Amino acid sequence: MYGILVLEDGTIIRGKGFGAEAEVLGELVFNTSMTGYVEILTDPSYNGQIVTMTYPLEGNYGVDKRWFESEGIKAEGFIVKDMTGIELDSFLKEYGVPGISDVDTRFITKKIRSKGVVKSLLKTSATEISEEEEKELVNKVRNYEDISDIDLVPEVSTKKVVKYPAKDEKISCVVIDCGVKQSILNCLLERGCSVVKVPYDTKEEEILSYNPDFVLVSNGPGDPEKMLETANTVKNLFGKLPVTGICLGHQIITIALGGKTYKLKFGHRGGNQPVKDSSTGKVYITSQNHGFATDMSNVPEGSILSHVNLNDDTVEGISKIMDSDNVKGVVWSVQHHPEAGPGPHDAMFLFDDMVALGMKFKQEKTSKR
C-alpha cells in the first residue's frame, strides 16, 4: 500500500502505507519514547494529532488490550521508520487508522523542532497517488483549521457517569474526565480509592453529590482555553474539598486559579523529561504528553511553583492552599504523567500523596459530624 504525508508548507513525504486505507488530517507531533506504542496510540490526549515515533522500530512486541489507555486508538495517524510484524498493522486497520513507514522520521522530527508543530495530512492508498492529487492534498492541509480552534475534549470524554469500586475501599474521588487514561484510574484503584468518572461538563453540585474525598481533573487533548466551562466548575470547587490535576487538568486548574497558559513550539511528548521538585530539590525522570504549558510569568497569585522542567524551565506543577486551617483548601497539580503509561515510574508516589490527601479530608469530615 502507498503512503503519503503532506505538510502545510508543501513538504511531501512518500513511504509505505499500513493499517487502514484512509485519509486523515491532524497536528503533526513527535514522541521520543522507546516503547509503549500501544499506550501512545490509545491515549485520548492524542486526539486530533498524527504521531511520529522517533525510535525507529515499532510493532516488534505485538499488541495486547491490557496495554490500552482507552477503548481504542485515539491518534489520527501513525508515522514510523520501520514497522515490524502484522499485529500493529491489524491493530490500526481494526480502528480505521492509517500509518506510514519507511520514511525518514529524523527529518520529520527535526522539521517539527525547527518550525514547530504543523498541520498535516496522512493518506494511505492501494493505488499510487498522482502529482495532481498531491496538489489537492496540500490545499486540504492549508485549509484545515488549527487544532487550537477545535474543541477536542467532548470527543473523548465519557458521555455518562461511570463508577469504579476499589477492591479494598479506603476513600473515593471524582475524576473529571477530559480524556482520562486507564493507567490513572488503575493507579487510584490499586491504592483503595474508588472512582466516579464524570463528563467534562459536569457541574459542581453533581460532583459534590457523590461525596468524594478529593477531585482529580484528568489529562486530555487540545487547548486548555477551550475548557473555560470546566475551569469555572473547578474554581467553584476550591475550598470545598481537595482538588488535584494531571496534564490538561493541571492547565485547567491554572486557569481556574486565575493564571494563563500558552502553546509550546513542539511540546513535550516522551518518557525522558527531567522534572525538579522545588521543595526537595529531587529530580524525577517523567513521562509527558502536552503541547501547552502554564505561563511562568503569570503563575496565579499566592500559588507555589512546585515542579520545574529542567530542559526548558517550563512549569511542571503548582500548588495553593485556600484555607491554612483545613485540608479542604488544598489545590495541587502536575503537568507530567506520574502514572507513566508508557514511561518511568519515578513520580508514581504522587498517587500516594493524592490518596493521603483524600484520607486526611475524609477524617476531617468524619470528626465534624
UniProtKB/Swiss-Prot annotation:
Active-site residue list: C247, H337, E339
The ranges of region (CPSase) come to: 1-168
Protein's UniProt keywords contain ATP-binding: yes
Q: What CDD domains does the entry give? A: GATase1_CPSase (cd01744)
Give the highest taxon in the source lineage: Archaea
Q: Which residues form a coiled coil?
A: none
Q: Which residues bind L-glutamine?
A: S45, G220, G222, L248, Q251, N289, G291, F292
GO process annotations (BP): 'de novo' pyrimidine nucleobase biosynthetic process; 'de novo' UMP biosynthetic process; glutamine metabolic process; L-arginine biosynthetic process
What reaction is this protein's catalytic activity?
hydrogencarbonate + L-glutamine + 2 ATP + H2O = carbamoyl phosphate + L-glutamate + 2 ADP + phosphate + 2 H(+)
Q: In which pathway does it act?
A: Amino-acid biosynthesis; L-arginine biosynthesis; carbamoyl phosphate from bicarbonate: step 1/1; Pyrimidine metabolism; UMP biosynthesis via de novo pathway; (S)-dihydroorotate from bicarbonate: step 1/3
By its UniProt entry, which Pfam families does this protein fall under?
CPSase_sm_chain, GATase
Q: What is its EC number?
A: 6.3.5.5
Family, according to the entry, reads as follows: Belongs to the CarA family.
Q: What binding partners and quaternary form does the record give? A: Composed of two chains; the small (or glutamine) chain promotes the hydrolysis of glutamine to ammonia, which is used by the large (or ammonia) chain to synthesize carbamoyl phosphate. Tetramer of heterodimers (alpha,beta)4.
Q: What does this protein do?
A: Small subunit of the glutamine-dependent carbamoyl phosphate synthetase (CPSase). CPSase catalyzes the formation of carbamoyl phosphate from the ammonia moiety of glutamine, carbonate, and phosphate donated by ATP, constituting the first step of 2 biosynthetic pathways, one leading to arginine and/or urea and the other to pyrimidine nucleotides. The small subunit (glutamine amidotransferase) binds and cleaves glutamine to supply the large subunit with the substrate ammonia.
Q: Which PANTHER family match?
A: CARBAMOYL-PHOSPHATE SYNTHASE SMALL CHAIN, MULTIFUNCTIONAL TRYPTOPHAN BIOSYNTHESIS PROTEIN-RELATED
Q: What is this protein called?
A: Carbamoyl phosphate synthase small chain
What broad taxonomic lineage does this protein's source fall under?
Archaea, Methanobacteriati, Methanobacteriota, Methanomada group, Methanococci
